[in-house]
Swiss-Prot record:
Record InterPro entries: ACT-like_dom_sf, ACT_dom, Formyl-FH4-Hydrolase_C, Formyl_transf_N, Formyl_transf_N_sf, PurU, PurU_ACT
Domain of life of the native organism: Bacteria
ACT domain span: 21-102
Entry similarity comment: Belongs to the PurU family.
Biological process terms in GO annotation: 'de novo' IMP biosynthetic process; one-carbon metabolic process
Pathway: Purine metabolism; IMP biosynthesis via de novo pathway; formate from 10-formyl-5,6,7,8-tetrahydrofolate: step 1/1
This protein's name: Formyltetrahydrofolate deformylase
Keywords annotated in UniProt: Hydrolase, One-carbon metabolism, Purine biosynthesis
Active site: D244
Amino acid sequence: MKSYMTQRLDEYRDGNEDKGRLLVSCPDQPGIVSAVSAFLFEHGANIIESNQYTTDPEGGRFFLRIEFDCAGIREKKSSLQAAFASVAEKFDMTWSLTLASELKRVAIFVSKELHCLHELIWEWQTGNLMAEIAVVISNHEEARELVERLNIPFHYMKANKDIRAEVEKKQLELLEQYDVDVIVLARYMQILTPDFVSAHPNRIINIHHSFLPAFIGANPYKRAYERGVKLIGATSHYVTNDLDEGPIIEQDIERVDHRDNAEALKNIGRTIERSVLARAVKWHLEDRVIVHENKTIVFN
């Protein structure tokens, strides 16, 4: 008998078996939308959602996300990709074609604080995050009971700076074993090495507990309290080798005042962190994010 979540994911796949997503980035010039639309029409596709943005109509960069229905797209995917290559070459495009029914496989990394993990699992169970949670990896045991109760593989891996390279080697092997597409750092309190980051470019999503670029690094709530801030926030971003400086996907804030001590700021911040991370992960799973330089275009 299939589990509740297996049934839910199968129903989503069946309901979206003909849905494709096309992401495009190229130098801005006349005729891009016309050429892409004509291509989709010629191949029997019907556009159901389209968003575009240009950094500058004259000499800027153009970005496009199209969601479309195309009967039998799973069988046609390879031929569509081959045929679209000529359009892409004409406009010097960077592009990707994905299927909504091909759910991304997610690995969640977590430490002792579980509020972000709880939020991701809740959003997943309610159908707001359509993905396969392939594995949860932690340097603490606190999450094991929650994760294994849902029949999600859980791996405890002790981690600190002295054994980081050794641990990351094992983690990378696990990610390959579970065929992971995206990694979510749900308050995973370890700094990743350049080797780890380079193995998954723009596929590691972090939540930082401050409104970046304020209070980069550790203990942001304590420093925010000492500074007497009137706003606190959270930032979800792709991980790069520059600590907390990767392309920002989503941010949010809430007002605070002098009556809020460091612990109160932390409690308020947890609520913001949960929702910000969940939105960022959702948009990545739905192919709504394009990275440009050190920024993102988010078609949400």
